């Protein structure tokens, strides 16, 4: 049946009559929904769409050849003039098949991550030209879209007409929009701005029948550790309002292919409902099972779920807490504990709380004995620490008198409510060990209870050696970004493998069950009692995400081993011993090249006598090749001198975990990354980050136009008359195709501006590089990793300002507040992308910095370069 304007007018009258009747029933939600639908009916866009539909069906498809004039006149007689709708329409810049947003503020949607650069994607200089604005015009709609117009449900900005047929459902306040999937590093994460309408209250939570939902074999823990819930969401203007990650092709946590909630968007449908949480695992969307599907299939299931979406989720049971007050008196080492967490710097995903991550031996907290690792700080004196930033929490703890009152929430169960919590030890230790270990081994005997955990009321630091059990203990660790978080030594002549160092904040440290001097007996059932160092390292490296370790505390054996190593070191340093005699033997000789992630000067670190200096020292040229210009993220000299007068309140910042320690001496030291030498046949792209990067980029291209160039970006906007495809832009006809290419990681960075996509493709960068020019890229730090994945290793140079005054001196147009913000952004940038920088430069003047950048690019141009490898140390 053809859709005619008189039918739309009649529907509008019926809706208005129904709205009038509703004013007496007191249902504000339904009245608001109907009011929004009425506004859509009154919009000029809807009028234009109905006009097009009627023209198409009545005029173009009329087999009786009725005069167009009659149809047109009838249309205008049966439909009121535009000005009676009392709506204003903004200018349209929409091309074919792109509808125009009506009466909605223009917002910006980004594909890129939250980098330091939040400006709109440039069109060489400015993509927005006021002269291009055009008056309202009739939108061209394809035949496919026209055939669907009878079910238009509404409209929001940045959307396409993508209507859904929903029987017996009142049209919603907003229309479907195409989901915008951000460019993401592995694992992929998708924001669920997935379209659809409907106005219906969400029912109460329903517990899913757990018998019908089989447990995923990849998820740690027993059924007793989890709870299940059905959550029904109604799509809002921004879709469902959450982000997901995971899938069989891109596991989010270890090898677990489940689909996890990674972000709840403030103000979205999920946030308003209040039941969905970060780290929830989606088992089913309506009737579609998404437990063992690819990431794209999960996204598709959410897109096609309709306007009312039922999510069946699984989550770990919440942790019960005990609130207590703790009084501390500051000592020489201050309060004596470290913290992590806060808004924007979550220690546990989805949790903004401030957590204690380390108790410093000899400090006030250690002597008091009540605070433990994993305790949550709720308040300090009269200052609330809930929902505050990490910096605010640090400031509150620093600005305290000698007597400090802390309000603390102590967990009453062993593991915290996070996705990395290990499974229950008693239930997971079955036949696994016995299947791999001889029955004669004492490993098959019942294990003694492990030492007190990080949540035990007994402080581990207060236990003496005599109080620690010497029997085999079972420890379950979950590998993190820093690996397992400990170092091993030993493996010579069957003397055993010992733990020599535990990384602060790493999985081993947070577990609290391992200590220096532990002998590793087995890893995942592999007997290491007689293993060489290489065999032990291989067993740990290949143990997977969940690692089960049997360890024994053997401090006496470890002390003897340390003494042996000390004697060997003294012999090597005090005599000219030839390579191989008197040194530790390894069963397999191997050369390993590493890059220092800090400012390294070998002449200051190692003392060589006159006989061995000529063999062991590195000349300047080779040192520059092996060790990149990377600097430790620490306080400068001035700030260090200022803090010495109040050393008990000195705060050091851990660059890897934003963990603040209330101590006076120790700093977190970055380690090494494994590298390999590679020959490149192209000119490496150049990415300069930090203050004054635009000036440096412009100067490089101006001074060396034959060595530096820029690539041609892509866009979905229509080509202007004076533009040339391939010179000004690569004009993409299909927005869907560009969105697909973005999802397929063919772009190093992309964004949206004025409803059009802009992006820099890997292929565009490669074309410039293969022509023998360094491609200058004005992109964020995330693009460095994406280029590396594409085998285009960029020269990434970070301009590190010395101070706020240094920035103001180089750019006199900046006000002091602007300079401070620029400095803070630079520090955050360094902290986030330090390991990806090729070099860091500093200088008092722009000219000095520019000369350093030119020298670095010349040195790093190849043809032989050092590139990071996936292999961990």
Curated annotation (Swiss-Prot):
- Endoplasmic reticulum as a keyword of this entry, yes or no, is yes
Recorded hits in InterPro entries, A to Z, give: DLG1-4_PDZ_assoc, DLG1-like, DLG1_PEST_dom, GK/Ca_channel_bsu, Guanylate_kin-like_dom, Guanylate_kinase_CS, L27_1, L27_dom
Q: Does the keyword Membrane apply?
A: yes
Q: Which Gene3D superfamilies match?
A: 2.30.42.10, Guanylate Kinase phosphate binding domain, Helix hairpin bin, P-loop containing nucleotide triphosphate hydrolases, SH3 Domains
- Where is each PDZ domain found? 230-317, 325-412, 474-555
Give the start-end ranges of region Disordered.
62-135, 441-464, 636-662
Q: What is its main location?
A: membrane
Ranges for domain Guanylate kinase-like: 683-858
Q: How does it sit in the membrane?
A: Peripheral membrane protein
Q: L27 domain: which residues?
A: 4-64
- Which portions of the chain have biased composition (kind: Basic and acidic residues)? 63-77
One MF term from GO for this chain? Answer: protein kinase binding
A single GO CC term for this protein reads: apical plasma membrane
Start-end of Polar residues biased regions? 85-96, 441-456, 650-662
Biological process (GO), any one: receptor localization to synapse
Q: Which family does it belong to?
A: Belongs to the MAGUK family.
Indicate what this protein is called per its UniProt record: Disks large homolog 1
Q: What is the lineage of its organism?
A: Eukaryota, Metazoa, Chordata, Craniata, Vertebrata
Which gene name belongs to this protein? dlg1
């Amino acid at each position: 049946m053809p859709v005619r304007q008189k039918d739309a007018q009649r529907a509008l009258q019926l809706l208005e009559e129904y709205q009038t009747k509703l004013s007496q029933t007191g249902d504000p939600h339904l009245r608001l929904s109907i009011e929004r639908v009425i506004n859509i009916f009154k919009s000029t866009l809807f009028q234009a769409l109905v006009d097009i539909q009627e023209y198409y069906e009545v005029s173009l498809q009329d087999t009786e050849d009725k005069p167009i004039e009659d149809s047109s006149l009838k249309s205008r007689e049966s439909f009121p003039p535009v000005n009676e709708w009392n709506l204003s329409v903004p200018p349209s810049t929409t091309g074919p098949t792109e509808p125009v947003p009506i009466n909605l503020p223009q917002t910006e949607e980004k594909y890129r991550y939250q980098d330091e650069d939040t400006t709109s994607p440039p069109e060489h200089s400015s993509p927005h030209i006021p002269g291009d604005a055009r008056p309202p015009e009739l939108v061209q709609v394809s035949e496919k879209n026209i055939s669907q117009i009878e079910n238009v449900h509404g409209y929001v900005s940045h959307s396409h007409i993508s209507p859904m047929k929903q029987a017996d459902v009142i049209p919603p306040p907003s229309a479907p929009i195409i989901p915008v999937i951000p460019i993401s590093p592995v694992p992929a994460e998708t924001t669920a701005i997935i379209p659809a309408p409907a106005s219906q209250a969400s029912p109460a939570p329903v517990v899913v029948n757990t018998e019908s939902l089989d447990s995923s074999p990849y998820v740690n823990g027993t059924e007793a550790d989890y709870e299940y819930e059905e959550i029904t969401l109604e799509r809002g203007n921004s879709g469902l309002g959450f982000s997901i990650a995971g899938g069989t092709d891109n596991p989010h946590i270890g090898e677990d292919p489940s689909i996890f909630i990674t972000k709840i968007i403030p103000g979205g449908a999920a946030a308003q409902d209040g039941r969905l949480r970060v780290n929830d695992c989606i088992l089913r969307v309506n009737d579609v099972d998404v437990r063992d599907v690819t990431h794209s299939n999960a996204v598709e299931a959410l897109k096609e779920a309709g306007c009312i979406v039922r999510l069946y989720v699984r989550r770990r049971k919440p942790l019960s807490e005990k609130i207590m007050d703790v009084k501390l008196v500051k000592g020489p080492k201050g309060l004596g504990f470290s913290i992590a967490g806060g808004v924007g710097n979550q220690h546990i995903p989805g949790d903004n709380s401030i957590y204690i991550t380390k108790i410093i031996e000899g400090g006030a907290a250690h002597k008091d004995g009540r605070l433990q690792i994993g305790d949550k700080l709720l308040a300090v004196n009269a200052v609330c620490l809930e929902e505050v930033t990490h910096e605010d929490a640090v400031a509150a703890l620093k600005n305290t008198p000698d007597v400090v009152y802390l309000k603390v929430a102590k967990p009453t169960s062993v593991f915290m409510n996070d996705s990395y919590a290990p499974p229950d030890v008693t239930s997971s230790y079955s036949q696994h060990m016995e299947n791999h270990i001889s029955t004669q081994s004492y490993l098959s005997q019942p294990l003694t209870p492990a030492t007190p955990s990080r949540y035990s009321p007994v402080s581990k630091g207060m236990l003496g050696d005599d109080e620690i059990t010497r029997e085999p203990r079972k420890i379950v660790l979950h590998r993190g970004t820093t690996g397992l978080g400990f170092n091993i030594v030993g493996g010579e002549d069957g003397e055993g493998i010992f733990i020599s160092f535990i990384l602060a904040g790493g999985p081993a440290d947070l577990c609290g069950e391992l200590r220096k001097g532990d002998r590793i007996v087995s890893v995942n059932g592999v007997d290491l009692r007689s293993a060489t160092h290489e065999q032990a390292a291989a067993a740990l490296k290949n143990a997977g995400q969940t690692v089960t370790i049997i360890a024994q505390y053997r401090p006496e054996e470890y002390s003897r081993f340390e003494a042996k190593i000390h004697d060997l070191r003294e012999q090597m340093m005090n005599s000219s011993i030839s390579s191989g005699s008197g040194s530790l033997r390894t069963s397999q000789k191997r050369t390993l090249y590493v890059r220092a992630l800090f400012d390294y000067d070998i002449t200051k670190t190692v003392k060589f006598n006159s006989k061995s200096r000529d063999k062991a020292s590195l000349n300047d040229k080779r040192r520059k090749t092996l060790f990149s210009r990377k600097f430790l993220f620490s306080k400068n000299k001035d700030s260090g001198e200022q803090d010495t007068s109040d050393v008990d309140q000195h705060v050091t910042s851990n660059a890897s975990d934003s963990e603040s320690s209330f101590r006076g001496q120790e700093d977190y030291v970055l380690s090494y990354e494994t590298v390999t030498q590679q020959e490149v046949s192209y000119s490496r792209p150049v990415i300069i980050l930090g203050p004054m990067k635009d000036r440096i980029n412009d100067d490089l291209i101006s001074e060396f136009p034959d060595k530096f160039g820029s690539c041609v970006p892509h866009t979905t906007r229509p080509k202007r008359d004076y533009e040339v495809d391939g010179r000004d832009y690569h004009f993409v006809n299909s927005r869907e195709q560009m969105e697909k290419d973005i999802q397929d990681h063919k772009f190093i960075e992309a964004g949206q501006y004025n409803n059009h996509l802009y992006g820099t493709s890997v292929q565009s960068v490669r074309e410039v590089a293969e022509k023998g020019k360094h491609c200058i890229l004005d992109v964020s730090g995330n693009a460095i990793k994406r280029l590396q994945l594409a085998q285009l290793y960029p020269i990434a140079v970070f301009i590190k300002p010395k101070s706020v005054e240094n920035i103001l001196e180089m750019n006199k147009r900046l006000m002091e507040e602007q300079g401070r913000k620029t400095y803070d952004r630079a520090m955050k940038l360094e902290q986030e992308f330090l390991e990806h920088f090729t070099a860091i430069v500093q200088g008092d003047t722009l000219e000095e910095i520019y000369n350093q950048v030119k020298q670095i690019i010349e040195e790093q141009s190849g043809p032989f370069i050092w590139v990071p490898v996936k292999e961990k140390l």
